């Protein structure tokens, strides 16, 4: 994974036009400074939050369904249709998803590469008509946490994220802001039942995840480097 240096971190802090790029086996991510005016000119805004608990733990969502499996299933024209899946892509799926893929293969097989894969995501989503970005985040955070999270305040600096999924050949655009919540970390560690997020967790506990380095960079940039000034 791309190794970000303190010099590059400072470069993004000081230079509005600077773009920092990370690359993993699966994704290419660019991160750059932006502002509210830039967001308002975007007609299809997706806004996300790097949430910080009241005891200063950055939290992320663990998605219920992997993007890889969702992509495979979305191409299925009937429930019984068998689809080709690259075995190298199974490592980006959950064990129960891999099991279903194995059962539905032309020649049923056993996959021995089971691991502790987690699909990490920032909380948030698309801004609806007549919503502000803050109203959108308030709604999304409530929905994705089963009503657990309540917002204390937002930061006033925003990053623009461009995420290219090299396997799925799709590119996602969004904006990220820091969000301080009222809850302690211990208050949010419980199973969730909404359709998108199965649990919330500490970013610090996911250092072995492919996405960790760029998510940690976002955390450092928005918080440690004073991009997270409170509104």
From Swiss-Prot:
Active site: 140
Biological role stated in the UniProt entry: Decapping enzyme required for the removal of the 5'-end m7GpppN cap tethered to viral and host mRNAs to allow their decay in cells. May therefore accelerate viral and cellular mRNA turnover to eliminate competing host mRNAs and allow stage-specific synthesis of viral proteins. Acceleration of the turnover of cellular transcripts may even promote the shutoff of host protein synthesis. Does not cleave unmethylated RNAs or RNAs shorter than 24 nucleotides.
Protein EC: 3.6.-.-
Tree of life domain: Viruses
Single GO term (MF): hydrolase activity
Top enzyme class: hydrolase
Domain Nudix hydrolase: 74-217
Inducers of expression: Expressed in the early phase of the viral replicative cycle.
Keywords per UniProt: DNA replication, Hydrolase, Magnesium, Manganese, Metal-binding
Location of the motif Nudix box: 125-146
Cofactors: Mg(2+); Mn(2+)
Protein name according to UniProt: Putative Nudix hydrolase FPV054
One GO process term, biological-process aspect: DNA replication
Residues annotated as binding Mg(2+): 131, 144, 165
Entry keyword annotation includes Isomerase: no
InterPro entries in the record: NUDIX_hydrolase-like_dom_sf, NUDIX_hydrolase_dom, Viral_VD9
Protein family: Belongs to the Nudix hydrolase family.
């Amino acid at each position: 994974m791309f190794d970000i240096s303190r010099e590059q971190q400072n470069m993004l802090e000081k230079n509005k036009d600077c773009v920092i790029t990370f690359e993993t086996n699966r994704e290419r991510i660019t991160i750059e400074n932006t502002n509210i005016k830039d967001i308002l000119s975007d007609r299809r805004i997706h806004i996300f939050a790097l949430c910080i608990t009241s005891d200063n733990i950055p939290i992320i969502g663990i998605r219920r369904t992997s993007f890889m499996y969702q992509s495979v299933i979305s191409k299925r024209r009937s429930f019984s249709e068998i689809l080709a899946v690259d075995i190298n892509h199974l490592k980006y799926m959950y064990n129960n998803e891999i099991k279903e893929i194995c059962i539905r293969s032309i020649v049923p097989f056993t996959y021995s590469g089971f691991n502790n894969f987690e699909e990490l995501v920032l909380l948030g989503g698309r801004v609806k008509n007549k919503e502000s970005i803050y109203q959108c985040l308030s709604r999304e955070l409530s929905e994705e946490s089963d009503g657990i999270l309540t917002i204390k305040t937002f930061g006033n600096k925003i990053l623009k994220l461009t995420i290219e999924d090299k396997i799925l050949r799709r590119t996602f655009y969004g904006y990220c802001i820091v969000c301080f919540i009222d809850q302690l970390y211990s208050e949010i560690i419980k199973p969730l039942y909404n359709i998108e997020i199965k649990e919330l967790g500490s970013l610090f506990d996911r250092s072995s995840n492919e996405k960790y380095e760029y998510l940690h960079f976002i955390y450092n940039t928005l918080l440690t480097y004073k991009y997270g000034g409170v509104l």
